[in-house]
Design a protein with these regions (language model features):
Chain A
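Short edge beta-strand segments in beta-sheet-rich domains
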Residues: 33, 75-77, 105
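Generic detector of isolated residues embedded in canonical secondary-structure elements
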Residues: 15-16, 79, 123
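Terminal "cap-and-tail" regions of soluble proteins that handle hydrophobic small molecules
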Residues: 2-7, 64-72, 83-170
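Hydrophobic ligand-binding cavity/cleft-lining segments
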Residues: 1-61
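Glycine-rich portal/gate segments that line the openings of hydrophobic small-molecule binding cavities
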Residues: 39-93
């Protein structure tokens, strides 16, 4: 398994970031995400908002993957817990198909920055595990690891784009 | 606003999303968690969505993912 960790900061309050995060699709930096459906949503006994979404990603698949498994589309499950009291958003995302090729998990935590609570800090953890044998799995994981930072920049730009678009938030 | 994976559900989804986004900013973030003004729209959207998940055979993928938890 390959692991990637990252910490970053948005120059916007948590309330705005969490609102933008929820409605971050579509945006020009995530044009490969073609749909986002809400499967489940409820508030738990602690007042936290739970959401489960199904994302469909299309295209942008590396050539070796499409050759190996005829992959052009992928289903992603995204779960989030939002605690407005604590000002915390936790998310996990993972693919639910093509698991013979790869399981990619991503965890994010958004909370106010410790130094400046008008900013939002994000902690990201990504894991890539491929069950492929003969060294292929390692190559797949390495490939994902190499591409991940760029994808991360894209997804953050997407959130900022949506944030700008809906400046009237809260 | 994002589309549904099943085109015929997109109108119901977008109606629900509009309600939810407003609720999130103006109610939830302000501590009003018992307000359930979008429930009816969510129900309508889910009726369409769950039918589509069955027809398009996405359900088994979801079930397998939940079993693994």
């Amino acid at each position: 398994m390959s692991v990637y960790k990252d910490e970053s900061e948005f120059d916007a309050p948590w309330e705005n970031i969490s609102s933008a995060w929820l409605r971050r699709y579509p945006n020009p930096y995530s044009s490969h995400v073609v749909s986002a459906d809400v499967l489940e949503r409820y508030i738990d006994e602690k007042g936290r908002l739970h959401t489960e979404r199904l994302l469909v990603k299309q295209g942008r698949v590396p050539r070796w993957a499409s050759e190996l498994l005829n992959v052009s589309k992928s289903y992603i499950l995204e779960r989030s817990i939002i605690d407005a009291n604590k000002r915390e958003l936790l998310s996990e995302t993972f693919n639910i198909d093509h698991l013979k090729l790869l399981k990619a998990m991503e965890y994010n935590r958004y909370q106010p920055s410790q130094e400046d609570s008008s900013k939002t800090s994000i902690t990201t953890l990504a894991q890539f595990a491929s069950p492929l044998r003969l060294g292929l799995g390692r190559r797949v994981q390495k490939y994902c690891l190499k591409r991940f930072p760029e994808q991360l920049i894209g997804s953050r730009r997407g959130i900022l784009y949506v944030l700008q678009k809906y400046k009237s938030f809260s | 606003m994002s589309s549904s994976f099943s085109e015929e559900c997109t109108p119901a989804k977008q109606k629900y999303d509009t309600c939810f986004n407003d609720w999130y900013v103006n109610k939830f973030l302000k501590g009003d968690i018992h307000n359930r003004e979008c429930d009816d729209l969510f129900y309508e959207y889910k009726q369409c969505l769950f039918k589509a998940l069955k027809v398009k055979k996405v359900e088994p993928l979801l079930e397998a993912a939940r079993k693994e938890d």
